[in-house]
From Swiss-Prot:
One of its GO terms (cellular component) is membrane. It comes from the Eukaryota. Pfam families: Death (PF00531), Ig_3 (PF13927), TSP_1 (PF00090), UPA (PF17217), ZU5 (PF00791). Residues 31-440 are extracellular. Residues 654-802 form the ZU5 domain. The gene is unc-5. It comes from Drosophila melanogaster. This is Netrin receptor unc-5. Keywords: Developmental protein, Disulfide bond, Glycoprotein, Immunoglobulin domain, Membrane, Phosphoprotein, Receptor, Repeat, Signal, Transmembrane, Transmembrane helix.
Amino acid sequence: MAVINKAGNVIALLLVKLQLILLFTLSVSGELPQLDYGSLSASLEEDAIDPLTAMAPFANSLVTEESAQHKNNAELLGNSSEDENVRPQQGSSSSGLGSSGAAGGSGILLEEFNSGKLSPGEASNTLPIFLIEPESVFVVKNRPAVLKCKASHSLQVIFKCSGSSQPPPSTHETHVDPHTGVNMEEVTATIHRDLVDEFFGDGPFKCECHAWSSRGVVKSQAATVHIAYIRKSFNQSPTSLRLELGSRAELRCEPPGGFPEPKLTWHKNNAVITADSEPGITVSAGTLIFRQVALQHMANYSCSAENIAGRRVSDSAVLIVYVNGGWSTWSPWRECKCAGKPSQGRKRSRTCNNPMPLNGGAQCPGPQIQKSADCAACPEDTQIVSPDGFDISSSKRMARWSAWSDWSICSAECIQVRRRKCLTQGQTQISSEAEEAGDLLLGAPGVGMAALIAAAGVGAVGSPSEATGSSSDIIPGYGKSLCAGKDIQTAECRGEQCQIGKDDFDWTLYLGLAFITAVCFAFGTALICCARRGIRTNPHYNMARSVMDADYMPGVVEKKEMRMHIEASNMGYDYVNPGHRYLPGEHIMGMGIGCGGVTEHHYDVPNLSANYTNPIDHLSVDYLSETGESSTADTSNSTFDMNGKLSILNASKSSTYEMLGSAGGQLRLYGGELLLFVPEHAIGKHVKKHVSLLLLSDECSRVSCATESSILCSSVVHSAPRNYSFVKPVILKIPHCLVAPEQWHVHIYHADSEHDELSVNWRRAVSVGEETINTPMFVQLEATHVFIMTEQLGHFTVVAEPRIQQPSIKMKLLAFSQHTPPSNANCSLRIYVVKDFPNSRDICANVEAKLGGSFLGESQVFAFTLNSRNLNIRVRSADVEAAAPYEHAIPYQHILSNNSILHCEFSLRRQDQNSLCVDFGQGSEDDYYTFNIPAHSMSGSAEELASTTNTTISIDRQGNYVNESCVMDFVQLPHATKRLICGALDPPRADERDWRLLAKKLNTDRYIAYFATKASPTEQILNLWECRANSSPGSSSNSVSHTIMALLLTLKEMGRQDVLDIIVETIGPLWI
């Protein structure tokens, strides 16, 4: 029987555990009914458990509390009833808890647990006890709120918030008390503002903590989460006041809206105002009260509002305390005394210093000086005339002269006139300034009246009332008899004011200037003639060292040979010369790899003077070797003896300069390929500037590129003046050698240096496509040219980096021949490989001119592909097919070394009857290019190079063209027309049919923000359009008319008929 009872007890215990597991599962899923846990715990604590009725209490509880569960599920968190019943009721008194509810029971259990009165067995059978409950908090936009909850005897603790079935982001921690073995759960929830904003239920957003154990679930008190904010603007800011000393004042401030209510604080000069720091100031809610303002209260006052969301400070209010002036006591009477006269009468004075006027306070009323009726008047030379008149007692009126008027204009008789008036005055006293001036001058005899009048500030011209003020009047019946002396003075005109008998033209001055000019011109001419004569007296300056007489160079018996075997070394000679300009290291380039047994021709370069006017035909050249092979050389480091600094403007054809003013102008080189456009009014009014434009060869400037893949793709351009900031951007047009510019990263390099400086500091000014609002330049990149808009001139060049594999650049070949005697069977042919720059031919021609060479011809421009392949050059006879060609390969790396005058040399047999063909290319022979050298070019006669035309175009103020030869070869809108167009297109429109659409139509809108930063965006766009539309000097007027017509069509497409009418009306039908 005992065994049966024991088995029954075990089964009952198992059923109880299964029931607890079921209850825990239901509670987690949200379907747990609100049970009477006190009755449940009392039933479980009975001494005897009937195995057949062990489930009865649970069944009864489930049935009786089902309706309560539905009722509680219908209520949402955040309602007022929820705050009253936040814990389940516990009804049995046998559990050790009172029947008053969960709040009281939990409080008793917490006290017993903390005091240690609760045994471990009793603790294991209790509901969870909250040690930390969440409290109401505020959440800010950028700072979330944190809620904490901690409970003992719990298996799990989570937060549940309004309007959400999922708990907020939380972190959980579990602890076990080492003394009691009680499990403790702690959870920290992070509440972001987004979660609060998403709640649209009734009442505020609330969160509560739920703790579960084997006995059931307990809810903590609800914590309210509010959104804290503070607005930016104050509802009322303090206003500035100007008050008299001792008056009462109030400053009012109403803080901006916010939650929680912002706390208001007053500040004086940014220091917080407290009752201790400012005893005379009372601070109340939003009001700052001054019982009696004092001078120490003058300050800047502001108020600040602060809450958990932030802090706001109002605008400052200035409190100005002014002081009205007060008179001091009268001084003792003293005698009236004038210089050289006995004393007569008395006077006394007082001072406006009790107190002195401060901060704009009123001056003291009334006179400063009192005089007796018989006070002696000083002579005329020390009389004082003031705007207030003279001080006269009320019993007697006295007359005084006013100040003299200004001298009149010279009459036809060369006479000037000035006048004065006899004035009288009533009760008005003399001003303090005039009296003080009179006191100072009493003892100074001989002081003129004009000085005293100037000190008193009397007007010179006007009626007596205007001179003396409103209180002055002229006594009826009295005239000039009251005043001694005359009222008019006349004088003869002085200086150059009188033009009687003088001619309009001063011949003496102009004859003197003409004489001085003639003397200076004669002196300058004599100096130039002497300088040229000194150069010609020594013919050895124009001779090579190899042809000088042995007597002139004693000790030099024979000239040493200078040979270099290309197979032995690939480095070229780096001739050292003190006058030669070079950059160490980077300018030394490797030579081309030639055939076996090949020697390179080197020349004894003649000593050249700095003056290039001497005939080049007198130069003598010796060959050091004669072979039938070819070689390559880098002539950028040739040993030209340029003693001193060679002026680029004198030594190069690639330069032009002009004195320009506000009318603007253009400077052109190489037929307009290189252009500097100075718009109208880019130079200040009444200012003229020496503007120059020149190309620098590679000898003069080398650009250190940032990366190995960077290529110098334009000539180095120097423009001046470099230290002048133009009023408007000028435009520089530079040709480049890029094929398909969109395949390259293009950069503009700039250096603020003179053209003859040895050390040039280059910097990257603009990277096309990477401009910012602070970029000082605008770059318009086109297929063949780059247009740069800038306000600062200096050195400019274009550097590019490839975007794709194997891009191409434009290059060409130039052929030159060495002058040799007709008896010589061999002739020398040098072929230069250069980039397609405008001055490439001039650079090579200058080198050849010094070596005695002549120009034979050039190839067409070809695309050199960056594919690491060498450039093969082959020279053959055009008439004899069987003749073996001369062939040479120039290494790929030598071509890309940024060296514009790399060349190879061929030594050929002279055959006057045969022409030559030069084949060149990188790939197979099918892709070779060919150009011919006529037979007569090899005969030895030098071909004159085509002269380079440098054009300077100037425009007058009305937009007319000054140079008649260039009247219609470029586009230029008159200034008046351009001004009207800018007035119509500069104002922005909602439909954007303004300067922005014009830039888009003219394809200049790549970086439109540059134009937006200028005073007139339309003017800059039109200036760039004019520069792009400029044609070469030889073009006809039809192309100019077509350009203007294209602009009219553009404006018509924009729908701006008003702008089109402006052009037609101001320019006329000439353009149309």
